[in-house]
């Protein structure tokens, strides 16, 4: 897919705002690669918000016991109810903390499962950022997006 017909939507599920900072870095990396994108915090969004994009990029933290952040619940539940995303590609940047081994990046895994079940195709391995790794999530997010975005140009 060339960037000429690629329109990416970056959708952010966050509790503290860190995932939103990651989304900003991903948006910058895509722009540098020549890919048009729009970034949306998931507050109040439903599955209709996905329609304009053929590439979906989900940036999601995990909180509690592997839960989707509150602002992403409506969109997530809409996807769980079933929507046809065949023909759409997606990439996933998950935030978590390995000190919570049982639920590390569990929300990211849940997004992956629901997008796949709706017929979307993941185009790059899930990037799982570990809050206890000593790296800044937003730096890792930008570098991750820059690595694969070049292959779509």
Task: Please place each PLM-identified region on the residue numbering.
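Non-catalytic terminal/interface segments that mediate subunit docking, oligomerization
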Residues: 10-12
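FMN-binding flavodoxin-like domain, especially the glycine-rich phosphate-binding loop
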Residues: 2-7, 17-21, 29-33, 40, ...
């Amino acid at each position: 897919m060339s960037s000429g017909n690629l329109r990416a939507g970056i959708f952010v599920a966050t509790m503290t705002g860190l995932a939103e900072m990651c989304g900003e870095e991903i948006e910058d990396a895509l722009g540098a690669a020549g890919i048009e994108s729009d970034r949306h915090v998931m507050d109040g969004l439903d599955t209709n918000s996905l329609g304009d994009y053929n590439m979906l990029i989900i940036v999601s933290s995990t909180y509690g016991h592997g839960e989707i952040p509150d602002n992403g619940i409506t969109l997530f539940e809409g996807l769980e109810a079933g929507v046809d995303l065949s023909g759409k590609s997606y990439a996933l940047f998950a935030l978590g903390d390995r000190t919570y081994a049982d639920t590390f990046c569990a929300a990211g895994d849940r997004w992956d499962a629901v997008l796949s079940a709706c017929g979307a195709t993941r185009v790059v391995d899930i990037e799982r950022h570990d809050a206890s790794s000593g790296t800044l999530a937003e730096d890792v997010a930008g570098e991750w997006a820059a690595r694969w975005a070049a292959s779509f140009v």
